[in-house]
Amino acid sequence: MTEAAPTRIYVDADACPVKDEIYRVAERHGLPVSVVAGSFIRVPTHPLIERIAAGSGMDAADDWIAERVQPGDIVVTADVPLASRCVKAGAEVLAPNGKPFSEESIGMTLAVRNLMTDLRSSGEITGGPRGFTPRDRSAFLAALDTTIRRIARRRPSPPAQPQT
């Protein structure tokens, strides 16, 4: 019987405001982290943290994550199309503000994102999302911890070792 790979956290890192929080939570739970960016990004030196410079293509970092993510992994991204791809692959996906993306919500989220993009490009709406707040940071930490615990409960326990 093969053992399930440990949960890995993938970070869409180019504009992620909660990288430091992810590193701390991952270390506490002993989970590996892949920090994926389009180019070089500074990360702490730690055996659980892997830095990936995916290349300068428009969606290089997104493609790198989407091609590797598996059920039971966690992806942190504000990129709705990437979130959609990862949800379809069976991953748990969180926005940096702690909002989870799910199979039930991703279709509507993607439709709203596309509508807002069209409205912005036509000049109907100017500006972008509100700024990131300490409340968002706290909500993210709570959501990440809850997600890790939920995944751990779903994974089968390792077989008991025979006593000698």
From Swiss-Prot:
InterPro entries found in the cross-reference section: UPF0178
Domain of life of the source: Bacteria
Annotated coiled-coil segments of the chain: none
Family indicated by similarity: Belongs to the UPF0178 family.
PANTHER family: UPF0178 PROTEIN YAII (PTHR35146:SF1)
Protein name, per record: UPF0178 protein RPB_3201
Native source organism of the sequence: Rhodopseudomonas palustris (strain HaA2)
